[in-house]
């Protein structure tokens, strides 16, 4: 019989769990008990609750995300890059009887200090679904990952998503704004500005001035700012993009469309893989190996 196993995506604020029989998902569950929201419960107790009626004797559990951080269940040490894709699933951290945490990745050079935790699992899945020499993984912190067919060679992080949130919600740029609305035109205008002038520090206050003076509709500030930041990010990473034969974009639907537009404006073709699809493919491959 094909082995059963449980895959867990356990982040700071949420937990998602899947019960698999081979490659077939039997059931999935979600919880708001992220590692920073355990409400006094132990991680083991939360896991037992979420997987009630799932765990037969010795059913393996493989987890990824912030559960392996210093605020999680137990620190799963980072693997230093360069690192083979295969080594990620070979260096799991045990936290119980057949319960495992996937390690994160780190870079520590004079000119680059970086970490990732959770995205490494997406990378494994993305590599299987759309092999590439450059993986771009937008989100709160966008990861730019250089790889070949066997190993991850380097990565950088750009805090575009978090910066957008901070500027819109905790700076003068967003002070007193009405509810924001979608606007493809405002996003495109910001994108063009960011691509053409990636040094955005002098431009940020202009976003505020533009809506104060009425040249930018106040309801469209978020869209313009999003375009400005994404354009500046992609333009500033031109050297990372140069000479790449294939680019894989790993993200949800909304961010995929925004980054695709940015890459197309630079004349780059990309292949898109849904972030959730990549994560499940990656953690399934590791958990399946553990179970068998």
Swiss-Prot record:
Quote any Pfam family the record assigns.
DGOK
Functional pathway = Carbohydrate acid metabolism; D-galactonate degradation; D-glyceraldehyde 3-phosphate and pyruvate from D-galactonate: step 2/3
Which factors induce or repress this protein, as stated in its UniProt record?
Part of the dgoRKADT operon, which encodes proteins for the metabolism of D-galactonate. Negatively regulated by DgoR. Expression is induced in the presence of D-galactonate.
Q: Which CDD domains match?
A: ASKHA_NBD_KDGal-kinase
What molecular function terms (GO) are annotated for this protein?
2-dehydro-3-deoxygalactonokinase activity; ATP binding
User: Which GO biological process categories is it annotated with?
Assistant: D-galactonate catabolic process
Q: What does the record give as EC number?
A: 2.7.1.58
Catalysed conversion reaction: 2-dehydro-3-deoxy-D-galactonate + ATP = 2-dehydro-3-deoxy-6-phospho-D-galactonate + ADP + H(+)
Cystines in this chain: none
Q: What happens when the gene is disrupted?
A: Deletion mutant cannot grow on D-galactonate.
Q: Which residues cross the membrane?
A: none
UniProt keywords (A-Z) are: ATP-binding, Kinase, Nucleotide-binding, Transferase
Q: Cite the InterPro entries for this sequence.
A: DGOK, DGOK_C, DGOK_N
Keyword Lyase present in the record's keywords: the answer is: no
The record's similarity note reads: Belongs to the DgoK family.
Q: What is this protein called?
A: 2-dehydro-3-deoxygalactonokinase
Q: Which organism is it from?
A: Escherichia coli (strain K12)
Upper lineage is: Bacteria, Pseudomonadati, Pseudomonadota, Gammaproteobacteria, Enterobacterales
* Designated gene of the protein: dgoK
